[in-house]
Regions:
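Active-site-proximal, acidic helix/loop segment immediately C-terminal to a metal-coordinating Asp/Glu
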Residues: 1-2, 87, 91-143, 160-170
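Histidine- and acidic-residue-rich, metal-dependent catalytic cores
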Residues: 13-14, 48, 71, 118-123
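Acidic loop->beta-strand submotif enriched in PP2C/PPM serine/threonine phosphatases
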Residues: 27-29, 64-106, 144-145
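Predominantly a core beta-strand signature of beta-propeller blades
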Residues: 58-61
Length: 173
């Protein structure tokens, strides 16, 4: 089985379970597979906080737009497509809950407000050098957590060099 087909089937399995709840329950999800040989990342993001790529000291989002609603949302099966991204040696993928963005801050007058700017998390990733414990520390130093806070870090072979990767990697499926 091709990884993108397996991923699509598993997504639809989960989606059908949540459809059976008839609107009483939805979940956001980021689900993916990495080919350990080529570094190809196959993934789908259903209204989950955007996936971060940390490469060469810079953090950026893999997604640029919302393309899929939460699992359990009716009539989106035809909108499902598997995203493909080519990881390079040393690349780090970071994903996590929306608690990473929703922080309680104080303005100059001491008035509390909620920071919801997703771009701020990219700064915390860079300040933390892509290391989870440092990122978490920087997030907590920036503001008070108001929601659940979880992070997941996946790195592609940090010991490989680019010349050891296969030359042909698909752009999309």
């Amino acid at each position: 089985t091709y990884p993108e087909i397996w991923l699509q089937e598993r997504f639809l399995d989960l989606h059908n379970v949540f459809l059976s709840f008839e609107g009483s329950m939805y979940i956001s999800i980021c689900l993916g597979l990495i080919d350990n040989t080529t570094g190809v990342l196959y993934y789908v993001n259903a209204e989950h906080p955007w996936t971060v790529l940390y490469r060469d000291g810079k953090a950026s989002f893999l997604e640029q737009e919302l393309s899929l609603r939460k699992i359990g949302t009716p009539d989106q099966e035809d909108q499902l497509y598997i995203r493909i991204f080519n990881l390079m040696p040393g690349d780090v993928i970071i994903t996590g809950s929306d608690g990473r963005d929703d922080l309680v801050l104080r303005n100059q007058d001491g008035v509390e407000f909620i920071q919801e700017d997703e771009q701020q998390f990219l700064m915390r990733v860079e300040e933390g050098d892509g290391k989870l414990s440092r990122i978490a520390q920087r997030v907590k130093e920036t503001g008070a957590l108001m929601d659940d806070f979880s992070l997941l870090r996946i790195s592609f072979d940090e010991s490989l060099t680019e010349t050891e990767l296969p030359k042909e990697i698909p752009d999309q499926v």
